[in-house]
Amino acid sequence: DVTEKSRMKGIMVDNHIPTAEYMVYHNLEEIDWKKVTFPSVVKPVDCNSSKGVHRVDNIDEAKKYAAEAIGLSRTKTGLIEKFNSGNEIQVDCFVTDEKVEVIMTRQKQKIIAENGMVLQSFGSIVPAPLSDALMKEVEDIANKIAKGFKLKNTPFFYQAIVSEDNHINVLEFAPRIGGGLSYYLIKMVTGFDIVEAAIDSFLGNKVIVNKKQAKKVYSTNLLYMHPGVFHHIEGFEKLKKENIIKDLSLIHI
């Protein structure tokens, strides 16, 4: 239920977790195109990360990427959902036996999608600039996710859109630590070692969530490059010494 997006969306609807309107399909012929509004997002139901996720702005793009989604899906199933404009956030959480804790929030910086571009992020702002009312909604949604999906003693995170009129729509969630350097960022910002907590939960040890409020605003920045031979980076050590940059990681793909 947590790796297949159509079942995930169904459980969200059943548990009153706000999420975008959607339809599931197995072939293009069963799609009622009169019900598809634009812009929309097309994706396979069971691929990881942003693989096969496209914003579509017209029927031709929708048909093209709907067919691609079927081809990428292990179960040959795609999903079309309403595109909600606004700021994308990620909410990192940990649920113990007793309660759900929101550990950290971040606002993603998104590449402006055009010409069928895969939706990706080029960085984030930590913590996300959310009002007290929105933080209360963030916490309520985290509790609904934990209850609806019967989560106990596990890290999880969810991604959502905060609309211009301050409503939250959940995109998806995963019962694990966020990918990439999330574990490092969470520990640096909040002091909470989410990897150690996850291991303790797997071993049956009691997890105590001790975290601190972020005293600074952090920015992560992803630099994408064209294929080539990497040589070196200049100026990083100087910026790190001056405490302008906290750290840098090189990821080879």
What are these regions (language model features)?
Residues 57-58, 93, 223-226:
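Short beta-strand-to-loop capping motifs
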Residues 167-168:
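Conserved protein kinase catalytic/activation segment
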Residues 77-78, 144-149, 206-211:
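Short helix-to-loop capping/linker segments positioned immediately adjacent to catalytic or ligand/cofactor-binding
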Residues 2, 56-59, 185-192:
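Short, conserved loop/turn and helix-capping segments at secondary-structure boundaries
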Residues 82-89, 93-151, 155, 162, ...:
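ATP-dependent carboxylate/phosphate-activation module, predominantly the ATP-grasp catalytic core
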Residues 31, 197-251:
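Peripheral (often C-terminal) accessory segments that flank ATP-dependent C-N-forming ligase machineries
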Residues 3-79, 84-86, 96-98, 128-144:
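Active-site nucleotide/adenylate-binding loops and adjacent lid/helix of ATP-dependent enzymes
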